[in-house]
Swiss-Prot record:
Record protein name field: Large ribosomal subunit protein bL35
Gene3D superfamilies noted in UniProt: 4.10.410.60
UniProt key word Ribosomal protein: yes
Entry GO terms, CC: cytosolic large ribosomal subunit
A GO MF term: structural constituent of ribosome
Keywords, comma-separated and alphabetical: Ribonucleoprotein, Ribosomal protein
Assigned protein family: Belongs to the bacterial ribosomal protein bL35 family.
Keyword flag Transmembrane helix: no
Cited Pfam families: Ribosomal_L35p
Record NCBIfam families: rpmI_bact
PROSITE patterns: RIBOSOMAL_L35
Length: 67
């Protein structure tokens, strides 16, 4: 059976947790247009990593076959 290809865009955006059972992602809305956003929103709400929702996890795992 041939090797499976990894979707490189997904590989840059997602990584597994320490146990490997769940997938971590970065939160959105923190790239540009930050002047009008409050520092609370930027620092407290958007700085932490988030888990990929279980409904989307299957699709992410299909894009990353060796994760």
């Amino acid at each position: 059976m041939p090797k499976l290809k990894t979707r490189k865009a997904a590989a840059k955006r997602f990584r597994p947790t320490g146990s490997g059972k769940k997938i971590i992602r970065r939160k959105a809305f923190k790239n540009h247009l930050l002047e009008h956003k409050s520092s609370e929103q930027k620092h407290r709400r958007l700085s932490n990593l988030a888990l990929v929702h279980e409904a989307d996890e299957k699709n992410v795992r299909l894009m990353l076959p060796y994760m």
